[in-house]
Protein backbone atom coordinates (compact mmCIF):
# COMPACT_ATOMS: atom_id res chain seq x y z
CA UNK A 1 0.00 0.00 0.00
CA UNK A 2 2.85 2.34 0.89
CA UNK A 3 4.49 2.00 -2.54
CA UNK A 4 1.19 2.59 -4.33
CA UNK A 5 0.64 5.68 -2.20
CA UNK A 6 4.12 7.01 -3.04
CA UNK A 7 3.45 6.51 -6.75
CA UNK A 8 0.05 8.19 -6.60
CA UNK A 9 1.45 11.14 -4.68
CA UNK A 10 4.23 11.56 -7.22
CA UNK A 11 1.73 11.48 -10.07
CA UNK A 12 -0.40 14.05 -8.26
CA UNK A 13 2.59 16.36 -7.96
CA UNK A 14 3.41 15.90 -11.64
CA UNK A 15 -0.13 16.84 -12.60
CA UNK A 16 -0.07 19.72 -10.13
CA UNK A 17 3.00 21.41 -11.59
CA UNK A 18 2.47 20.26 -15.22
CA UNK A 19 6.19 20.50 -15.89
CA UNK A 20 8.62 18.92 -18.30
CA UNK A 21 10.26 17.23 -15.31
CA UNK A 22 7.38 14.77 -15.44
CA UNK A 23 7.53 14.37 -19.19
CA UNK A 24 5.09 17.15 -20.05
CA UNK A 25 6.87 19.76 -22.07
CA UNK A 26 5.30 23.19 -21.93
CA UNK A 27 7.35 24.96 -24.53
CA UNK A 28 9.39 26.88 -21.97
CA UNK A 29 12.64 26.38 -20.12
CA UNK A 30 13.02 22.87 -18.64
CA UNK A 31 11.72 22.39 -15.12
CA UNK A 32 14.37 22.95 -12.51
CA UNK A 33 16.09 25.84 -14.28
CA UNK A 34 16.09 28.82 -11.96
CA UNK A 35 14.30 32.02 -12.73
CA UNK A 36 17.48 33.73 -13.77
CA UNK A 37 17.50 31.64 -16.92
CA UNK A 38 14.09 32.89 -18.02
CA UNK A 39 13.66 36.31 -16.49
CA UNK A 40 14.86 38.09 -19.64
CA UNK A 41 12.19 36.43 -21.73
CA UNK A 42 8.88 38.24 -21.94
CA UNK A 43 5.68 36.62 -20.70
CA UNK A 44 3.71 34.80 -23.36
CA UNK A 45 1.00 37.44 -23.27
CA UNK A 46 0.55 41.06 -22.36
CA UNK A 47 0.19 41.51 -18.61
CA UNK A 48 -3.47 41.62 -17.64
CA UNK A 49 -3.47 42.66 -14.01
CA UNK A 50 -6.22 44.32 -12.02
CA UNK A 51 -5.86 46.04 -8.67
CA UNK A 52 -9.12 45.86 -6.74
CA UNK A 53 -10.02 47.69 -3.53
CA UNK A 54 -12.83 46.47 -1.26
CA UNK A 55 -15.05 48.94 0.54
CA UNK A 56 -16.49 46.67 3.25
CA UNK A 57 -16.53 43.07 4.45
CA UNK A 58 -19.45 42.09 2.19
CA UNK A 59 -17.91 43.53 -1.00
CA UNK A 60 -17.33 40.71 -3.52
CA UNK A 61 -16.75 42.74 -6.67
CA UNK A 62 -14.20 45.30 -5.60
CA UNK A 63 -13.43 48.65 -7.19
CA UNK A 64 -10.60 48.84 -9.71
CA UNK A 65 -7.65 51.10 -8.90
CA UNK A 66 -5.85 52.29 -12.01
CA UNK A 67 -2.33 53.68 -11.62
CA UNK A 68 -1.96 57.21 -13.00
CA UNK A 69 -5.72 57.71 -12.58
CA UNK A 70 -6.01 59.46 -9.19
CA UNK A 71 -9.79 59.76 -9.47
CA UNK A 72 -10.05 56.00 -8.91
CA UNK A 73 -8.58 56.41 -5.43
CA UNK A 74 -11.55 58.50 -4.35
CA UNK A 75 -14.03 56.35 -6.24
CA UNK A 76 -12.75 53.24 -4.48
CA UNK A 77 -12.61 54.81 -1.03
CA UNK A 78 -8.85 54.64 -0.51
CA UNK A 79 -7.92 56.15 2.88
CA UNK A 80 -4.29 57.25 2.95
CA UNK A 81 -4.27 57.39 6.76
CA UNK A 82 -4.88 53.64 6.97
CA UNK A 83 -2.40 50.87 6.11
CA UNK A 84 -2.80 48.97 2.84
CA UNK A 85 -3.10 45.17 2.85
CA UNK A 86 -2.84 43.62 -0.62
CA UNK A 87 -3.79 39.98 -1.19
CA UNK A 88 -2.00 38.16 -4.02
CA UNK A 89 -3.36 34.80 -5.16
CA UNK A 90 -1.33 31.95 -6.60
CA UNK A 91 -1.31 29.65 -9.59
CA UNK A 92 -4.74 28.74 -10.98
CA UNK A 93 -5.88 25.40 -12.39
CA UNK A 94 -9.35 26.57 -13.43
CA UNK A 95 -9.04 30.28 -14.20
CA UNK A 96 -11.24 31.29 -11.25
CA UNK A 97 -10.41 33.29 -8.15
CA UNK A 98 -10.41 31.09 -5.07
CA UNK A 99 -13.17 31.47 -2.49
CA UNK A 100 -10.75 31.97 0.42
CA UNK A 101 -9.98 35.43 -1.00
CA UNK A 102 -13.39 36.74 0.07
CA UNK A 103 -12.97 35.17 3.50
CA UNK A 104 -9.70 36.94 4.14
CA UNK A 105 -11.10 40.22 2.76
CA UNK A 106 -14.08 39.94 5.10
CA UNK A 107 -11.88 39.07 8.08
CA UNK A 108 -9.60 42.06 7.46
CA UNK A 109 -12.43 44.55 6.90
CA UNK A 110 -14.36 43.36 9.95
CA UNK A 111 -11.57 44.38 12.36
CA UNK A 112 -12.99 47.79 13.18
CA UNK A 113 -10.35 48.47 15.83
CA UNK A 114 -7.63 48.30 13.18
CA UNK A 115 -9.09 49.75 9.94
CA UNK A 116 -7.10 49.02 6.80
CA UNK A 117 -7.43 49.41 3.06
CA UNK A 118 -7.87 45.91 1.65
CA UNK A 119 -6.92 45.20 -1.94
CA UNK A 120 -6.44 42.29 -4.33
CA UNK A 121 -3.89 41.77 -7.07
CA UNK A 122 -5.90 39.92 -9.72
CA UNK A 123 -3.40 38.34 -12.12
CA UNK A 124 -5.59 35.35 -12.94
CA UNK A 125 -4.98 35.46 -16.70
CA UNK A 126 -1.23 35.16 -16.10
CA UNK A 127 -1.65 32.56 -13.34
CA UNK A 128 -3.96 30.34 -15.39
CA UNK A 129 -1.10 28.91 -17.42
CA UNK A 130 1.19 25.91 -17.36
CA UNK A 131 3.02 26.10 -14.06
CA UNK A 132 6.42 26.98 -15.54
CA UNK A 133 4.87 29.84 -17.52
CA UNK A 134 3.04 31.13 -14.45
CA UNK A 135 6.36 31.05 -12.57
CA UNK A 136 7.94 33.20 -15.26
CA UNK A 137 5.07 35.67 -14.97
CA UNK A 138 5.53 36.19 -11.22
CA UNK A 139 8.41 38.61 -11.72
CA UNK A 140 6.40 40.73 -14.17
CA UNK A 141 3.40 40.84 -11.83
CA UNK A 142 5.67 41.80 -8.94
CA UNK A 143 7.04 44.70 -10.95
CA UNK A 144 3.50 45.89 -11.70
CA UNK A 145 2.62 45.76 -7.99
CA UNK A 146 5.74 47.80 -7.23
CA UNK A 147 4.68 50.35 -9.87
CA UNK A 148 1.31 50.72 -8.14
CA UNK A 149 2.94 51.27 -4.74
CA UNK A 150 5.40 53.79 -6.15
CA UNK A 151 2.52 55.70 -7.73
CA UNK A 152 0.70 55.78 -4.36
CA UNK A 153 3.89 57.03 -2.75
CA UNK A 154 4.38 59.80 -5.30
CA UNK A 155 0.76 60.92 -5.71
CA UNK A 156 -0.58 60.40 -2.17
CA UNK A 157 2.63 60.56 -0.10
CA UNK A 158 1.61 57.08 1.04
CA UNK A 159 4.56 55.50 2.84
CA UNK A 160 5.65 52.10 1.59
CA UNK A 161 6.21 51.13 5.23
CA UNK A 162 2.39 51.02 5.61
CA UNK A 163 2.09 48.29 2.97
CA UNK A 164 1.47 44.64 3.88
CA UNK A 165 1.50 42.11 1.02
CA UNK A 166 -0.08 38.71 1.67
CA UNK A 167 0.85 36.20 -1.03
CA UNK A 168 -0.32 32.60 -1.35
CA UNK A 169 1.78 29.98 -3.17
CA UNK A 170 3.15 31.71 -6.29
CA UNK A 171 1.68 34.93 -4.93
CA UNK A 172 4.23 34.83 -2.12
CA UNK A 173 7.04 35.12 -4.65
CA UNK A 174 5.11 37.83 -6.52
CA UNK A 175 5.19 39.72 -3.22
CA UNK A 176 8.92 39.20 -2.98
CA UNK A 177 9.52 40.52 -6.48
CA UNK A 178 7.30 43.52 -5.69
CA UNK A 179 9.38 44.30 -2.63
CA UNK A 180 12.71 43.92 -4.41
CA UNK A 181 11.51 46.08 -7.33
CA UNK A 182 10.68 49.12 -5.20
CA UNK A 183 14.17 50.60 -5.37
CA UNK A 184 15.84 52.87 -2.85
CA UNK A 185 16.91 52.09 0.69
CA UNK A 186 13.43 52.09 2.19
CA UNK A 187 11.41 48.88 2.08
CA UNK A 188 7.73 48.01 2.21
CA UNK A 189 6.48 47.24 5.72
CA UNK A 190 5.63 43.56 5.68
CA UNK A 191 5.25 40.52 3.45
CA UNK A 192 3.45 37.36 4.55
CA UNK A 193 4.05 34.21 2.48
CA UNK A 194 1.31 31.60 2.77
CA UNK A 195 2.92 28.26 1.88
CA UNK A 196 5.16 29.85 -0.78
CA UNK A 197 5.44 27.68 -3.89
CA UNK A 198 8.31 25.19 -3.97
CA UNK A 199 8.85 23.94 -7.56
CA UNK A 200 11.32 26.16 -9.45
CA UNK A 201 12.02 28.19 -6.28
CA UNK A 202 13.46 25.64 -3.83
CA UNK A 203 17.19 26.15 -3.48
CA UNK A 204 17.39 29.29 -5.61
CA UNK A 205 19.20 32.45 -4.57
CA UNK A 206 17.32 35.08 -2.50
CA UNK A 207 16.84 37.43 -5.47
CA UNK A 208 14.94 34.69 -7.32
CA UNK A 209 12.27 34.10 -4.67
CA UNK A 210 10.73 35.63 -1.56
CA UNK A 211 13.44 36.45 0.97
CA UNK A 212 13.90 38.50 4.18
CA UNK A 213 15.47 41.27 2.10
CA UNK A 214 12.17 42.10 0.37
CA UNK A 215 10.48 43.94 3.28
CA UNK A 216 11.15 45.32 6.72
CA UNK A 217 9.48 42.22 8.10
CA UNK A 218 8.80 38.91 6.33
CA UNK A 219 6.91 35.97 7.82
CA UNK A 220 6.00 32.69 6.15
CA UNK A 221 3.72 29.75 6.98
CA UNK A 222 4.77 26.38 5.51
CA UNK A 223 2.04 23.72 5.42
CA UNK A 224 2.77 21.33 2.52
CA UNK A 225 6.50 20.65 2.20
CA UNK A 226 6.27 16.85 1.93
CA UNK A 227 8.69 15.75 -0.79
CA UNK A 228 8.13 13.12 -3.47
CA UNK A 229 10.59 12.60 -6.33
CA UNK A 230 12.46 15.63 -5.01
CA UNK A 231 9.39 17.87 -5.41
CA UNK A 232 7.14 19.55 -2.87
CA UNK A 233 4.20 21.87 -3.45
CA UNK A 234 5.32 24.34 -0.79
CA UNK A 235 8.90 25.51 -0.38
CA UNK A 236 10.70 23.72 2.43
CA UNK A 237 13.64 26.02 3.10
CA UNK A 238 13.31 29.01 5.45
CA UNK A 239 12.78 32.21 3.45
CA UNK A 240 11.61 34.78 6.03
CA UNK A 241 12.46 36.45 9.31
CA UNK A 242 10.00 34.07 10.96
CA UNK A 243 9.22 30.76 9.23
CA UNK A 244 6.39 28.79 10.84
CA UNK A 245 6.06 25.03 10.27
CA UNK A 246 2.68 23.94 11.71
CA UNK A 247 2.70 20.22 12.52
CA UNK A 248 6.19 20.02 11.05
CA UNK A 249 5.13 21.70 7.80
CA UNK A 250 5.12 18.56 5.68
CA UNK A 251 1.41 17.81 5.88
CA UNK A 252 -1.61 18.81 7.96
CA UNK A 253 -4.11 17.01 10.21
CA UNK A 254 -7.38 16.27 8.47
CA UNK A 255 -5.74 16.04 5.02
CA UNK A 256 -5.38 12.44 3.86
CA UNK A 257 -3.81 11.23 0.64
CA UNK A 258 -5.21 7.82 1.56
CA UNK A 259 -8.64 9.18 0.59
CA UNK A 260 -7.44 10.29 -2.85
CA UNK A 261 -8.85 7.27 -4.73
CA UNK A 262 -12.22 7.68 -3.01
CA UNK A 263 -12.30 11.37 -3.89
CA UNK A 264 -11.43 10.67 -7.54
CA UNK A 265 -14.26 8.13 -7.73
CA UNK A 266 -16.70 10.70 -6.35
CA UNK A 267 -15.47 13.93 -7.95
CA UNK A 268 -13.27 12.94 -10.90
CA UNK A 269 -9.87 14.52 -11.47
CA UNK A 270 -10.95 17.64 -9.58
CA UNK A 271 -10.35 15.54 -6.47
CA UNK A 272 -6.61 15.76 -7.12
CA UNK A 273 -6.69 19.53 -6.74
CA UNK A 274 -8.93 19.25 -3.67
CA UNK A 275 -6.57 16.80 -1.99
CA UNK A 276 -3.49 18.93 -2.58
CA UNK A 277 -5.27 22.15 -1.63
CA UNK A 278 -6.23 20.72 1.75
CA UNK A 279 -2.65 20.96 3.03
CA UNK A 280 -1.38 23.72 0.73
CA UNK A 281 -4.31 26.01 1.50
CA UNK A 282 -4.18 25.28 5.23
CA UNK A 283 -1.69 28.16 5.44
CA UNK A 284 -4.44 30.52 4.28
CA UNK A 285 -6.97 29.22 6.79
CA UNK A 286 -4.47 29.45 9.62
CA UNK A 287 -3.96 33.10 8.71
CA UNK A 288 -7.73 33.73 8.50
CA UNK A 289 -8.09 31.98 11.86
CA UNK A 290 -5.64 34.46 13.39
CA UNK A 291 -7.97 37.28 12.27
CA UNK A 292 -11.22 35.65 13.33
CA UNK A 293 -9.99 34.31 16.68
CA UNK A 294 -7.63 37.00 17.90
CA UNK A 295 -8.11 35.72 21.46
CA UNK A 296 -6.87 32.26 20.43
CA UNK A 297 -3.54 33.05 18.81
CA UNK A 298 -1.41 30.08 17.72
CA UNK A 299 2.07 30.25 19.22
CA UNK A 300 5.12 28.91 17.39
CA UNK A 301 8.36 28.05 19.15
CA UNK A 302 11.87 28.26 17.71
CA UNK A 303 13.39 24.82 17.26
CA UNK A 304 16.01 23.14 15.08
CA UNK A 305 13.72 20.33 13.90
CA UNK A 306 10.36 18.66 14.47
CA UNK A 307 11.87 15.69 16.33
CA UNK A 308 13.25 17.95 19.06
CA UNK A 309 9.98 19.87 19.17
CA UNK A 310 8.01 16.62 19.59
CA UNK A 311 10.04 15.92 22.72
CA UNK A 312 8.96 19.25 24.18
CA UNK A 313 12.51 20.58 24.15
CA UNK A 314 11.77 23.94 22.52
CA UNK A 315 9.05 25.69 24.53
CA UNK A 316 11.21 28.72 25.25
CA UNK A 317 10.08 32.30 24.66
CA UNK A 318 13.23 34.12 25.73
CA UNK A 319 14.90 36.48 23.24
CA UNK A 320 12.10 36.25 20.68
CA UNK A 321 12.18 32.46 20.47
CA UNK A 322 8.38 32.27 20.26
CA UNK A 323 5.84 34.32 18.35
CA UNK A 324 2.21 34.39 17.26
CA UNK A 325 1.39 32.88 13.90
CA UNK A 326 -0.65 35.08 11.58
CA UNK A 327 -1.79 38.66 11.34
CA UNK A 328 -0.89 39.73 14.89
CA UNK A 329 2.67 38.44 14.89
CA UNK A 330 5.08 40.59 16.89
CA UNK A 331 7.11 42.43 14.29
CA UNK A 332 10.70 42.48 15.51
CA UNK A 333 13.05 44.40 13.25
CA UNK A 334 16.58 43.32 12.33
CA UNK A 335 16.01 39.86 13.77
CA UNK A 336 18.03 36.85 12.73
CA UNK A 337 15.83 34.43 10.80
CA UNK A 338 14.04 31.96 13.04
CA UNK A 339 12.38 28.61 12.33
CA UNK A 340 9.35 27.94 14.52
CA UNK A 341 7.21 24.85 15.05
CA UNK A 342 3.76 24.32 16.54
CA UNK A 343 0.92 21.84 16.66
CA UNK A 344 -2.60 22.71 15.47
CA UNK A 345 -6.02 21.12 15.39
CA UNK A 346 -7.57 19.86 12.15
CA UNK A 347 -10.16 22.64 11.99
CA UNK A 348 -10.76 26.21 13.14
CA UNK A 349 -10.13 27.37 15.76
CA UNK A 350 -6.75 25.71 15.23
CA UNK A 351 -5.14 26.61 18.54
CA UNK A 352 -3.77 24.02 20.95
CA UNK A 353 -1.88 24.50 24.21
CA UNK A 354 1.67 23.12 24.33
CA UNK A 355 3.17 21.49 27.43
CA UNK A 356 6.52 19.88 28.08
CA UNK A 357 6.43 16.98 30.52
CA UNK A 358 9.64 15.59 31.99
CA UNK A 359 8.96 12.34 33.81
CA UNK A 360 11.57 10.75 36.07
CA UNK A 361 11.29 6.95 36.24
CA UNK A 362 13.12 4.44 38.39
CA UNK A 363 12.95 0.95 36.87
CA UNK A 364 13.78 -1.70 39.47
CA UNK A 365 13.45 -4.54 36.98
CA UNK A 366 16.49 -5.81 35.11
CA UNK A 367 15.16 -5.32 31.58
CA UNK A 368 13.83 -2.16 29.88
CA UNK A 369 10.07 -1.78 30.14
CA UNK A 370 7.65 -0.45 27.51
CA UNK A 371 4.31 -0.15 29.28
CA UNK A 372 1.37 2.00 28.21
CA UNK A 373 0.51 5.02 30.33
CA UNK A 374 -2.25 7.61 30.46
CA UNK A 375 -2.39 10.88 32.33
CA UNK A 376 -5.32 12.94 33.64
CA UNK A 377 -4.75 16.67 34.06
CA UNK A 378 -6.75 18.81 36.47
CA UNK A 379 -6.57 22.57 36.00
CA UNK A 380 -8.34 25.54 37.51
CA UNK A 381 -10.68 25.69 34.48
CA UNK A 382 -10.95 22.20 33.01
CA UNK A 383 -10.06 18.55 33.53
CA UNK A 384 -8.84 16.37 30.67
CA UNK A 385 -8.86 12.63 31.25
CA UNK A 386 -6.70 9.76 30.04
CA UNK A 387 -4.23 11.42 27.71
CA UNK A 388 -2.11 8.65 26.11
CA UNK A 389 1.60 8.91 26.93
CA UNK A 390 4.15 7.76 24.34
CA UNK A 391 7.77 7.68 25.46
CA UNK A 392 9.24 6.33 22.22
CA UNK A 393 11.68 3.99 23.96
CA UNK A 394 11.88 1.48 26.78
CA UNK A 395 12.17 2.66 30.37
CA UNK A 396 15.60 1.97 31.83
CA UNK A 397 16.92 2.49 35.33
CA UNK A 398 16.63 6.01 36.77
CA UNK A 399 16.05 8.02 33.60
CA UNK A 400 14.09 11.18 32.81
CA UNK A 401 12.00 11.29 29.63
CA UNK A 402 10.81 14.47 27.91
CA UNK A 403 7.71 14.66 25.73
CA UNK A 404 5.31 17.20 24.23
CA UNK A 405 1.64 17.08 25.15
CA UNK A 406 -0.91 19.34 23.46
CA UNK A 407 -4.39 20.16 24.71
CA UNK A 408 -7.34 21.46 22.70
CA UNK A 409 -8.72 23.29 25.74
CA UNK A 410 -7.37 25.90 28.10
CA UNK A 411 -7.40 24.07 31.42
CA UNK A 412 -6.09 27.06 33.34
CA UNK A 413 -3.28 26.54 35.82
CA UNK A 414 -2.39 22.88 36.27
CA UNK A 415 -2.90 21.91 39.92
CA UNK A 416 -2.93 18.10 39.96
CA UNK A 417 -2.31 15.15 37.68
CA UNK A 418 -3.00 11.43 37.76
CA UNK A 419 -0.57 8.99 36.19
CA UNK A 420 -1.86 5.51 35.32
CA UNK A 421 -0.21 2.35 34.08
CA UNK A 422 -2.78 0.93 31.69
CA UNK A 423 -3.15 -2.83 31.98
CA UNK A 424 -2.74 -5.36 29.20
CA UNK A 425 -2.79 -9.15 29.20
CA UNK A 426 0.87 -9.24 28.21
CA UNK A 427 1.97 -6.94 31.03
CA UNK A 428 -0.18 -8.75 33.58
CA UNK A 429 1.56 -12.03 32.73
CA UNK A 430 5.00 -10.42 32.77
CA UNK A 431 4.32 -8.78 36.11
CA UNK A 432 3.12 -12.00 37.71
CA UNK A 433 6.16 -13.98 36.57
CA UNK A 434 9.05 -11.54 37.12
CA UNK A 435 8.11 -9.70 40.31
CA UNK A 436 10.57 -10.39 43.13
CA UNK A 437 10.65 -9.61 46.81
CA UNK A 438 12.83 -6.70 47.96
CA UNK A 439 13.44 -5.74 51.52
CA UNK A 440 12.79 -2.09 52.27
CA UNK A 441 13.18 -1.39 55.97
CA UNK A 442 11.13 -4.17 57.60
CA UNK A 443 8.34 -4.37 55.02
CA UNK A 444 8.47 -6.43 51.78
CA UNK A 445 8.10 -4.57 48.48
CA UNK A 446 7.86 -5.76 44.91
CA UNK A 447 10.44 -4.77 42.34
CA UNK A 448 8.88 -2.64 39.67
CA UNK A 449 8.46 0.92 38.49
CA UNK A 450 8.57 4.20 40.35
CA UNK A 451 7.52 7.57 38.92
CA UNK A 452 9.52 9.86 41.14
CA UNK A 453 8.98 13.40 39.83
CA UNK A 454 7.14 15.10 36.96
CA UNK A 455 8.29 18.52 35.78
CA UNK A 456 5.88 20.53 33.61
CA UNK A 457 6.37 23.65 31.50
CA UNK A 458 3.42 25.43 29.87
CA UNK A 459 4.52 26.83 26.52
CA UNK A 460 1.92 29.57 26.20
CA UNK A 461 2.35 30.95 29.74
CA UNK A 462 5.98 29.87 30.29
CA UNK A 463 4.97 28.68 33.76
CA UNK A 464 7.12 25.92 35.30
CA UNK A 465 5.68 23.45 37.80
CA UNK A 466 6.94 20.42 39.70
CA UNK A 467 4.73 17.51 40.77
CA UNK A 468 5.52 14.83 43.34
CA UNK A 469 3.60 11.70 44.44
CA UNK A 470 0.76 12.52 46.82
CA UNK A 471 1.54 9.40 48.89
CA UNK A 472 5.29 9.27 49.50
CA UNK A 473 4.89 6.02 51.47
CA UNK A 474 3.70 4.14 48.39
CA UNK A 475 5.83 5.05 45.38
CA UNK A 476 5.58 1.81 43.41
CA UNK A 477 3.45 1.83 40.27
CA UNK A 478 1.91 -1.45 39.09
CA UNK A 479 -0.29 -2.37 36.07
CA UNK A 480 -3.83 -0.90 36.34
CA UNK A 481 -2.67 1.36 39.18
CA UNK A 482 -3.07 5.14 39.17
CA UNK A 483 -0.94 7.55 41.19
CA UNK A 484 -1.89 11.10 42.14
CA UNK A 485 0.74 13.84 41.80
CA UNK A 486 0.47 17.25 43.44
CA UNK A 487 2.57 20.39 43.27
CA UNK A 488 5.70 20.32 45.36
CA UNK A 489 8.55 22.69 46.08
CA UNK A 490 11.36 20.82 44.34
CA UNK A 491 13.41 22.95 41.98
CA UNK A 492 12.06 22.87 38.41
CA UNK A 493 14.17 20.81 36.03
CA UNK A 494 15.56 22.91 33.15
Swiss-Prot record:
Region ranges (Essential for determining substrate specificity): 255-278
EC numbers, comma separated: 3.1.1.3, 3.1.1.5, 3.1.1.32
GO molecular function, one term: low-density lipoprotein particle binding
Residue positions with a glycan: 79, 398
Gene3D superfamilies referenced in this protein's UniProt entry, alphabetically: alpha/beta hydrolase, PLAT/LH2 domain
Regulation affecting activity: Phospholipase A1 and lysophospholipase activities are inhibited by annexin II.
Active-site positions on this chain: 169, 195, 280
Known catalytic reactions: a triacylglycerol + H2O = a diacylglycerol + a fatty acid + H(+); a 1-acyl-sn-glycero-3-phosphocholine + H2O = sn-glycerol 3-phosphocholine + a fatty acid + H(+); a 1,2-diacyl-sn-glycero-3-phosphocholine + H2O = a 2-acyl-sn-glycero-3-phosphocholine + a fatty acid + H(+); 1,2-di-(9Z-octadecenoyl)-sn-glycerol + H2O = 2-(9Z-octadecenoyl)-glycerol + (9Z)-octadecenoate + H(+)
Entry keyword annotation includes Zinc-finger: no
Keywords: Glycoprotein, HDL, Heparin-binding, Hydrolase, Lipid degradation, Lipid metabolism, Secreted, Signal
Subunit structure of this chain's protein: Homodimer.
Name of the featured protein: Hepatic triacylglycerol lipase
Species: Rattus norvegicus
